[in-house]
Amino acid sequence: MAILLGIFEEGLIYAIMALGVYITYKILDFPDLSVDGTFPLGAALTAGLIVKDISPVWALPLSFFAGVLAGCVTGFIHVKCKVRDLFSGIIVMTALYSVNLRIAGMKANLPFLSQDTIFDNEWTRNSLPASVRPYIVVIILAVIALICKFVLDWYLNTRSGYLLRAAGDNDTLVTSLAEDKGRVKIIGLAIANGFAALAGGVLAQKQAFFDISIGTGTMVFGLASVILGTQLFHRFGKLKATTAVIAGAILYKACVAFVISMRIVKATDLKLITAAILLLILIISDSMKRKGAHYA
């Protein structure tokens, strides 16, 4: 049961980030590596605020808006400075390493074990029935992930959301509608990095500490979740893509946990496992596309 809870906990946290990757990878077709910097940005800001006795609840929206700002910078560098998309993300990701250290007080590790978090506070300790307490983390994470999903679903059905989709599929259409396709891209990158930073803040509160290396491989996890979810559940026509992404994140975390539980590799090889599983998913996904094209 503990392993299952761990899978859902980690999967739901990274599902929030994967929703952002879905925007950049699937909708905008933008290889945004700044996610590896905005994820720890959210964690660093959350840790810094909680250490200063700021409410852990308020720390999350503030982390989201910090990610939005970072995403705007990535978009500005790409759109206004005419820097290629890949390089824009790398520049911001690199710069955020120093920014995150400064936010954390120049500390590579910032614990706040004695502070209240959204998962461990007076209400969760004293007001909940004993039978519910073991599941409170999963419940809270599910609520946050679902809120993010429904907000994104709502946004994608607005005029701005339709323009965002068009910017990825046919940016000429955006221009023909007298809209600035560059501005639309910046908005998409802002929202995507906002989700990444929010996920980082949630993870920091779950672990009760910030670590500067917390964002390493974030983009890989997000890509794997998006590809796995959308490829595996695309046959279910009524299933929204955002739901598939969340399911993909949980399933991907389950795959990683399964490989570790087999004791073939050590837990310290987590990043190696993550990369290997992503490679396998990409190979299978490409094979499925080729078969589909062959029978079409």
What are these regions (language model features)?
Residues I23, G48, C72, F76-K80, ...:
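Membrane-interface helix caps of multi-pass small-molecule transporters
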Residues V21, I54-T94, V99, A145-L146, ...:
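Alpha-helical transmembrane segments within multi-pass membrane transporters and channels
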Residues D85, I91-V92, L96-N157, I187, ...:
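Transmembrane helix-bundle core of multi-pass membrane transporters
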Residues D169-R183, F236, T243, C255-A296:
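Cytosolic-side transmembrane-helix boundaries in multi-pass membrane proteins
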